[in-house]
């Protein structure tokens, strides 16, 4: 325990030397104080409440300061974020976090994870029933221009902000003209894409560094990272489901006017009805 206390003190001392934002250091100290209180969830809102020291505080300005402080602390690996939970990092945890962030991953791994989340976890089917004739129709699954499995006549492509032409909405729309596919464009979400990358980096780092030669402290951190990644994946699925339900749909050269849905699969099924009607009039 004394060793851990010393390590934490070193983290605080280092932060005081390296950070110019004095409020960020205060937030870091508060996160240290609640690090081992399992019943206190360190969400942005709870941290914001914890840091109020004046009943007349301007809440909007205060929350902006909290936002800025947490961004600084996360970017410099003094804290880690998993979903909406922020956690103080000890020296060893900080070292591992920085090594994870510096782990190289390729674009194919990102596209593969997006496919697993959107098609395998949310849509879950490789056929969708057309309600007019009760017939099931196969479709090709595509993410950001990459297709998976054998190509079928009908095509469902999901576009994320990882796509090279994401900003060119007119181009995406024009690609559907005269085609037998539809495109669902997710709203830009930097947090989602950052968490996708962190999930892949964490899994790769943990796999590369597990083994009998690992120091006990690092082995413990790796085990915690692995458990946190399970939670991260669940959060990614929730975020993706919401984004898919709110996505823009393009088919046959036009934008399909549809109501948003709380459920991504429902949105896809409803849009698919329109696609089948256009392709097989």
Identify the function of each model-found stretch.
Residues 1-281:
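Extended alpha-helical scaffold and adjacent linker segments that couple domains
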